[in-house]
Each structure stands twice: as C-alpha cells, then as structure tokens.
Amino acid sequence: MAKKTVEGEHGTPKTNFTKKETSKNHDDFKKIIGHKVVEEHYVEYEVELTSGKTITATEFDFKGDDSLLSTYKKKVTKQSDDSSGEYAVERVLAHRKVKGSPLYLVQWKGYPHPVWNSEMWEEDLDNCKDLLAAYKKHQEDLKIAQTPKKTPSKTPKKTPKSLKRRALTPSDDEEEAGPIAPEPKKTPKQSTKKLKRTTSPETNLVEKSKKKAIPDLENHTLDQEKNDVIERVEEIQEDEDDDDEQREEVVTTAPVETKSRWGFGSWKWF
C-alpha cells in the first residue's frame, strides 16, 4: 500500500494525494526486473512492459497503481508496510523539476532503504513544513558556499620596458661580454699625467683641433726634417769650400824662400 504523510509527528494519516500526470503509462507495466541507486538517493527501476519492451522508470511513474512497486520493495528489503498506514517523514533528501514544479524526494521514519523513498509535490508536504523549510535553507547555504567570492583585483605597477627587460633577461652584449676584468691599478706617475691632462685648460680647448690636425702635422714634420737635413748638408759643404779657399790663399801668399846652391841662404847685398 502507498505511504501517507501524517499531520505533525504522530497524527492521523493524510489520505488525499495530489495526482498529477506521470511521464509513463503504468498500465503497460508487467513486472519489475531490477533497480539501481543513482545520485545517492534516487532509485531507477528496470521495468518490462506488456509489449515485451524494457524501459527505465522511477517511483513517481508508479503513482496511481503502486501495487507492483510495493510487492517488489517487500521482496528486496524483507520489510513489509505498516498495516495501519501511518508513516512519518524523517527528512527531505533531494528534489528535481518536473514540468517546472519541484518534486521532493523524502525518506520515511523506520524505512532507511532507498527503495522506500518517495517523491511528493510540495502541497503534499503541508504537515512537515518545518522539514521542507530546513531543506530549502540548506540548499541556499550550499549555493552561497559554492559561489566564488569576487575579490577586488589590484592593478600591478607597470615596470618600464627597459628596466623590466634588463631585470628578466640580460642583453646580448652583456651575455657575450662575460665577466668584467678588474681595472688595472695606476701608478702615481700615470695618475699625475692624467690629472695634468685633465686639468689643463689649454689642452681641453685644443684637444679636438689637435685630433683633427694630427695627419697634417705628421706630413709637415716629415717635410721639415727632410729640409733640415738638406740645409745641414749644404752648410757642411759650404764650410768645406771655405776651408779649401783659405788653404789656397795661405799657399799663394806665403813668401818664397830661395836657397843658394852654395848653401849660403838667400842673396844679400852689402
């Protein structure tokens, strides 16, 4: 026999169920072959039709003529219905939408096996509104808990491209350069020369002009040295000519001494 809700916890059974059209015609059901539990609480039954065809049906599809289903439940659970027909809802397990309306799955007190669970419309649960309200609140809490919380995203500070690239990946020049060699130590003399070169205002002023005039100065220096050599050779030649002339003059102007063949010197008149 069908289970009925009770008014309150221990009341008189409510006998008037709200009948709604099911998705299948139970008049064609011949026998239940087996069942399986799906989604923890629901039970799907494998049913053979009078035509010999096999279909899958739920507890809701047997509404109006559940004698076939009741016999199967007793056989599986080895538990019979209460002959008085009084049953109390222990809790609401789940629900699904049928033609836009919620159809609730309930568990009965003293009948823990899933095959005893029944699907009922909300208007059939008037006597257990507290249980239905608790179930609805639990569903809302689950929905809120499963909704990801939106946290304000902080915009990261933009890093300049040059600095970012330098920090993440070294440039090609830095990779090829390798380790930097230590700077050679400078002697006091070199440091002094460098200081003088740096601090000399004249050097700083004409530094660029000197760099530009280096090729001309080199050519001019070579020509000057060549001319100096030629002039020096000419001076030496002139000096030698002057010495020759002086020697000739000495030879030509010197007095000629004549000797007598007799050995008495030059002729003298007394």
Swiss-Prot record:
Residues 1-24, 143-229 are annotated as: Disordered. Residues 205-229 have a biased composition (Basic and acidic residues). Keywords: Coiled coil, Membrane, Nucleus. One of its GO terms (biological process) is chromosome attachment to the nuclear envelope. The keyword Coiled coil applies. GO terms for cellular component: nuclear inner membrane. GO terms for molecular function: methylated histone binding. The keyword Oxidoreductase does not apply. SUPFAM superfamilies: Chromo domain-like. Residues 151-167, 187-197 have a biased composition (Basic residues). CDD domains: CD_CEC-4_like (cd18961). Residues 87-147 form the Chromo domain. It comes from the Eukaryota. Interacts with mono-, di- and tri-methylated 'Lys-9' residues on histone H3. Weakly interacts with methylated 'Lys-37' residues on histone H3. This is Chromo domain-containing protein cec-4. It comes from Caenorhabditis elegans. The gene is cec-4.
